[in-house]
Amino acid sequence: RQMCIRDRGKMPEKSVYSLTEKGKQQFEKLMLEISCKPINIFLDFNAVIVNLDSMSRERQQECLDNIESSMEVLKKYLEENIALKKSKEDIPVTGMAVLRQQYTLAEAIEEWIASLKKEINS
C-alpha cells in the first residue's frame, strides 16, 4: 500500500492510498476466489422461524411481528440511503447496485413474512 497526501486548499489534507503491484495481484486473487465460492444466505431470524411451532400462537405472532418490524426499519433505511446516494456522482454504479440488491431482498423477505403470517393464522 502506498500513500500520498493531497493538498485540499482550506480543507484538511486528505490521505489517498493506492495498492502496490503485489497488493493489486493479491486483491485480484481474493476477488476471483470469493466470486467462485457458493453463495450463502444465512438469516439469523431463520432460527426463530424453524422453532415457531414450539411456541404459543401468541408468542409466534409476537416473534413474526418483531421480525416484520425489523425488516420495515431496514427497508426504510435502505430507501433513504438509496435516495441520498442516487444523485451523487461519486457513488460507483456497483455500490448503488448492492444497495438496490439489499432493498430487493428486504422487499422479498417482507412479502414472505406476510405470507407466513397468513399460513400460520389460517
Residue ranges and their predicted role:
Residues 118-122:
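Generic C-terminal helix-cap and adjacent flexible tail
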